[in-house]
């Protein structure tokens, strides 16, 4: 899902959202926890689509600032990943990024595929980042 630039032609406010199931093959830790790098990879994917929509180029991720891991991501989760363009320079793009858990696997011995949609999305990871568009 994406929201296109404002009517005045400014790309600021452009928003892209992806959803992704976290497979059990990505769990590395007790409790089916997934490492934080998984969220960073998803940020790269959503930022790439935003760059393509705004600039017609995949862009290059230059930096992340203030990455915060606020809640666990687990195998069996369904994640919503969002990038919002908050500032556009000549070649740099400033993004606000967020990973939210929207559904969580709750397997049991009797129901190994059990899961539920969360009443409210759980913010798992936030960051700001800078993407550079080649000149």
Question: What do the PLM-derived regions correspond to, one by one?
Answer:
Residues 20, 25-26, 59, 65, ...:
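Short, functionally important structural connectors and interaction interfaces within domains
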Residues 1-36, 50:
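Catalytic strand-loop segment that frames the active site of acyl-thioester-processing enzymes
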Residues 17-23, 68, 128-132:
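Generic structural detector for well-ordered beta-strands
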